[in-house]
Each structure stands twice: as C-alpha cells, then as structure tokens.
Amino acid sequence: MASGAGAGPAGQGGEADELFDVKNSFYIGAYQAAINEAQRIKPSNPEKETERDVFLFRSYIAQRKYGVVLDEIKANASPELQAVRMFAEYLSNESQRDAIVADLDKKMAKSVDVANTTFLLMAASIYFHDKNPDAALRTLHQGESLECMAMMIQILLKLDRLDLARKELKKMQEQDEDATLTQLATAWVNLAIGGEKLQDAYYIFQEMADKCSSTLLLLNGQAACYMAQGKWDDAEGVLQEALDKDSGHPETLINFVVLSQHLGKPPEVTNRYLSQLKDAHKNHPFIKEYQAKENDFDRLAMQYAPSA
C-alpha cells in the first residue's frame, strides 16, 4: 500500500508512480508540500485515491493536526484510512490510549491483512509510542514494503541493534537501492556506524535537501552528522536554520540542548531550549526522562542535606 517511492518518478516494473511527489515529500518531512500535492492531483483509480488520502492524512498527523483527520475520516472509510484514524485518535486523546492499545491487541491476535501496509505501519507506530518496541517490530515484520523495513530500521537503531538494522537495510537495497526511503535508511545506519561513514550520511541528507527541499528532518540529520564528527559550530548553523523554520520542533530543540552543552554556553541558554520543549511538547519522552532524572537528583540531594 504505502510502499517506497523511487529516486525517479517510476514505481516497480518501471511504470510511472502518479503519487511519487506526494510520497517523496512525506518521506523527507516536507509535510505541507505533500498536502498541497495530494490536494492538487487527480488519481487515476479508486486504489490510488485511497493511497493519496493515506499520505494526505498522515501528513496532517505529522503536523499534529489531528482534528482534520478525525473530522474527515468517517466510520465507513476504507480499512487503510480507518488505520490512519486509529493513530490520530491515539495521539490526540491521552485518556483513551490504553483502550486503543487494548483494542489493537485484539485485532493483532486475529488474522491481520498483511497486504494492508498502512494498518501495519499505524499499529507499529502506536506500539512504539506506547513504549512497546517488540510489538512494533513483530507487526512490521509481517510487511514487505520499503516503509515497513525503514521503520524497523529506525526502531532497531533506537534499541542499539545496529547488526539487525544492517540486515534490514540490505533487504531494502535489494528491493530498490535508489528509493528515497532506502537512501534515508542508509544515512541513518551510516550515522549509527560512525567514523568515515558519517560523511556518507551527511552527503545523503545534503543531496536530498538540494534536490527536494531542506526540511527539518534533513537538517537535523545533517546536524547529527556534524555533532558526531565534533563539528559543533557547523551543527549550530544548520540547527539555527531548522529553528527558523519551526521554533517548536522537538528534535531541533533537543539537539540544541546537546549542542549548547558542548559549546559551553551559559546554563540559562540550555534551560531556555528545555523550557521551549516543555511548553510545546510536555509529554515528549525526552522531557519525561529529564524530569525523572531531576526528581532522582532532588531525592538524593535531600538524603545528603545537612540536618538542622
């Protein structure tokens, strides 16, 4: 369903993919461009229309505009769109998350339509947000699309399983080496390998930015390459460009927190980025972890405080 777009506007078998620009924009994080293109094109058949709508609504989710998705996807929509709606419901309604996961568990216990790539991706996204990476990986393992493999690589790298991520990347390269998703996954793996591979990762992010547009996803990728190479000043320039595009983007703010520490900036600078992150994303895993560490520190400090 939501398979990877190639580097040129041709799908498997060499036929033109009329949704290439929509998919490509979505994959590199140019969500508004994906929305604009999805609203402009007239799909040639109902299947393509559904696929276009999947990318349209996933782009709205990426912009945190959950209301648009919940208002527009009705109960009689296709299974693919129902899956997108399920993810929007999960993200928009914290009090209902446990119930949504329980319902998803029941669906996964029955026979799942593995041809519905969108369902697998949305289910895996819910499990991963719910801190259950094993369930996310099990779900994705049932799919064969480039997007399922790319998401598996992201999760495996977060679990420090570079060995398994490299195996998945090899599968992606065998399926379509030039696909946008394969190129992105190559950059993520190179970033994890480090050393001289960091420059290769940087060039992939840079080439995509030059060819398409310099998105927050690509800029943060470039900044991560610079930081891993100890090029802190170069990283600052790229992150500043990202911050100018969106002053509340969580990954940019987290990278600025790390960067300001390494550049020896005053503590208030780091605290400013943390405050911005708390304001815009109070439930972000980084903030929750940071606050847990603060509480641990306060508790330890109390233990060692001099008694009056």
UniProtKB/Swiss-Prot annotation:
First-listed, main subcellular location of the protein, grouped into a coarse class: cytoplasm
Xref: Pfam families: Coatomer_E
Gene3D superfamilies cross-referenced by the UniProt entry: Tetratricopeptide repeat domain
Localisation per UniProt entry: Cytoplasm; Golgi apparatus membrane; Cytoplasmic vesicle, COPI-coated vesicle membrane
TM regions (residue ranges): none
Alphabetical list of PANTHER family matching this protein: COATOMER SUBUNIT EPSILON
Quaternary structure note: Oligomeric complex that consists of at least the alpha, beta, beta', gamma, delta, epsilon and zeta subunits.
Family: Belongs to the COPE family.
Function: The coatomer is a cytosolic protein complex that binds to dilysine motifs and reversibly associates with Golgi non-clathrin-coated vesicles, which further mediate biosynthetic protein transport from the ER, via the Golgi up to the trans Golgi network. The coatomer complex is required for budding from Golgi membranes, and is essential for the retrograde Golgi-to-ER transport of dilysine-tagged proteins.
Annotated protein name in UniProt: Coatomer subunit epsilon
